[in-house]
UniProtKB/Swiss-Prot annotation:
Keywords: Carbohydrate metabolism, Hydrolase, Manganese. Coiled coil: none annotated. InterPro entries: FBPtase_class3, Metallo-depent_PP-like. It catalyses: beta-D-fructose 1,6-bisphosphate + H2O = beta-D-fructose 6-phosphate + phosphate. Belongs to the FBPase class 3 family. This is Fructose-1,6-bisphosphatase class 3.
Length: 640
């Protein structure tokens, strides 16, 4: 028994009775129903769709409303749901449509509905937790109103008097907004983002700003997140890749406007050395309009950053033989006089290949001008306060994987051999496989983030390996064929052969083996993102007899034509796990004015035999440990 520990613990309580009260309180909490977890993945900068799914709780808010108000029509449910999703926008819309008296009556009626909804959704939480979910300035009055919302005639006048006074003071709208926010917070308790916040879509920064404000959230890093983290943390190679992808999808505003990164030097460089090429046409999502000059500039910038990326990658491949990336040293395979490249035993013609600054004798070498541009850009990335804040959030809330409430969350894969054995990755004569491999990567990511002044150390280079490496759990293919897709017409060179994991994950025994490696039993599930599920072709996101769920379904508009839907999410509550499929989101304006919602189709993945309690969760295990310590303290209180 650690006497000093228990003496410190005793100092937190005023008396022995206070210890007993805490034991009773924590024990009671352990018996409450498990709170709802919400899983999202591969949101790729699509803020409006992401924000809407957060606000509607993947359809769970409408479900709560139907349970709370069984007498309501579908139209009434939809109208009340919209008020909860977008309270300020809905109130503004109704205010414009209604006369003053009619609007005040609308507010009074809906305020009562929202009070009843809070009472309904909060019934599985302690009163303390519900109280803390209220804005502080409304805490007392809302608690009073909720307690009396269903009161009988004895206290009806008391309740009505409070409402009338609030109406006279003009507080109805503020209370409605506060209640709507509370309902959303209580309906979904915790959010998991299983990777890929960045790239393709226009607003990854707005997504992270939204996540920072959330009370309970975690992130499993995706490959697109890692490459941005690496760009901030000193990797010139990752930085070139980030700029190239932003140019490819017409999203330079993310860099220049959102993060305040000055691109003038590299834009001037691209204009000076490159001509537009068909393969580098920007891929613009529907609705984005650019002038011909703007498209040409993005085209040239994409070409310039691609060549700089290949130069820097060649340097990394040379200094990191452990990475076994020699087959990707593409600049050294080129016959510059013939404009051909030898890949393996085959020779291919290069189409529209421009390399005005490449020295055929030393293709990886940078010119003095390029060295200056890269140094300038690295400084600009490191100097962005907003990007710094976002990377720090990803570091604090993120990891390579998460084991939570019996489930394992990994963005991409766990590298395997064809026989199902864990594939090892050897660095500095140390082999890493399975969970140990992901722990190793996690450790190195944090080393890189701690030292952004380093650009060529092992930790920084491993950030790039996580983007392109065969044994990377975030990539898991033999090669990333960026060069081939740009310059070679023969599409067989574009194929990126996947790690056997992606076939073997259909087998329940393989998933059980992975779960066991991470200390989880066969009652758990593995959740992946990363690979879009092509539902329109009949692909099923539920695999391995329900042990594996893949939830990359196409939040990114660029992929929706391939997938046929606009994303999957998961809800895990005390009754089991539901998979939710979403249709494309239109606009907030349409959602408010017409009550349109992302159509959500739910499918039960796993139903529990007994309703899950808090004691069955990670939080519950912590509480049970605290209770055990408090029981020792209570029993020996006088001794300490």
């Amino acid at each position: 028994m650690d006497k000093k520990y228990y003496q410190l613990l005793k100092n937190q309580f005023s008396s022995k009775e206070a210890v007993l009260t805490e034991i009773i309180n924590l024990s009671a909490i352990c018996e409450l129903p498990k709170a709802t977890e919400h899983f999202m993945s591969d949101v790729h900068g699509e803020y409006d769709a992401f924000n809407h799914v957060l606000r509607n709780g993947s359809g769970s808010i409408k479900e709560k409303l139907r349970d709370c108000f069984p007498e309501f029509s579908a139209t009434e449910i939809s109208s009340l749901a919209t008020l909860i999703y977008y309270p300020q926008e809905k109130l503004d819309s109704e205010c414009q449509l209604k006369e003053t008296e009619e609007f005040e009556n609308y507010c009074r009626i809906n305020l009562v509905y929202l009070l009843k909804t809070v009472k309904f959704v909060g019934q599985k939480y302690t009163r303390s937790k519900v109280r803390k979910a209220f804005p502080e300035k409304f805490r007392y009055i809302l608690e009073e109103l909720i307690n009396e919302v269903d009161s009988t005639t004895d206290k009806r006048d008391y309740f009505d008097s409070i409402l009338s006074q609030l109406q006279n003071l003009g507080e109805f709208t503020r209370l409605i907004v506060a209640l709507a926010d509370t309902i959303r917070r209580l309906t979904v308790d915790h959010l998991h983002v299983v990777g890929d916040i960045y790239d393709r879509g226009p607003y990854p920064d707005k997504i992270i700003d939204r996540l920072i404000k959330m009370p309970s959230v975690d992130v499993q890093w995706g490959n697109h997140d890692i490459v941005w983290m690496a760009a901030f943390s000193g990797s010139p190679l990752a930085m070139m890749n980030v700029i190239r992808i932003c140019a490819r999808y017409g999203n330079l505003d993310i860099l220049e406007e959102s993060y305040g990164i000055n691109l003038r030097m590299i834009l001037e460089y691209a204009e000076r050395y490159y001509e537009p090429s068909e393969a580098f046409q920007p891929r613009l999502v529907e609705g984005v309009r650019l002038s011909d000059d703007e498209k040409a500039l993005l085209n040239k910038l994409q070409e310039a950053t691609a060549i700089l990326q290949f130069k820097l990658e060649s340097q990394l491949i040379k200094r990191r033989p452990d990475f076994q990336l020699e087959h990707r040293d593409v600049l050294h395979f080129i016959d510059f006089s013939e404009k051909t490249i030898k890949l393996g035993t085959e020779v291919y013609e290069l189409t529209d290949f421009q390399a005005p600054t490449v020295n055929p004798e030393q293709p990886e070498s940078l010119t003095a001008e390029e060295e200056k541009i890269i140094s300038h850009l690295l400084n600009n990335f490191r100097s962005s306060d907003k990007l710094k804040r976002h990377v720090e959030f990803l570091q604090e809330k993120g990891a390579m994987y998460l084991s939570y409430n019996g489930n394992l969350l990994i963005h991409g894969c766990l590298p395997l051999h064809e026989n199902g054995d864990f594939k090892s990755f050897t660095v500095n004569k140390e082999a890493h496989a399975g969970r140990d491999l992901l722990d190793f990567f996690d450790q190195e990511v944090r080393k890189c983030l701690a030292h952004p002044e380093n650009s060529t150390d092992l930790a920084t280079d491993l950030m790039w390996y996580l983007w392109v490496g065969e044994c990377s759990s975030l990539f898991g293919k033999t090669a990333m064929t960026t060069f081939e897709r740009y310059y070679i017409k023969d599409k067989k060179t574009h194929v990126e052969k996947k790690n056997p994991y992606y076939q073997l994950r259909e087998e329940a025994e393989i998933i059980r083996k992975i779960l066991e490696n991470f200390g989880l039993d066969e009652g758990g599930h593995l959740v992946n993102g990363h690979t879009p599920i092509k539902e329109k072709n009949g692909e099923n996101p539920i695999k391995a007899d329900g042990k594996l769920i893949v939830i990359d379904g196409g939040f990114a508009k660029a992929y929706q034509k391939e997938t046929g839907i606009a994303g999957y999410t998961i809800l895990y509550n005390s009754f089991g796990i539901q998979l939710v499929a979403h249709q494309p989101f239109s606009t907030v304006k349409e959602a408010v004015e017409k009550g349109t919602d992302i159509i959500s189709l739910k499918c039960l993945v796993a139903e529990v035999d007994q309703r899950k309690r808090v004691k069955d969760t990670n939080v519950g295990q912590t509480l049970l440990s605290e209770i055990a310590d408090l029981e020792v303290l209570f029993e020996h209180y006088e001794e300490f």
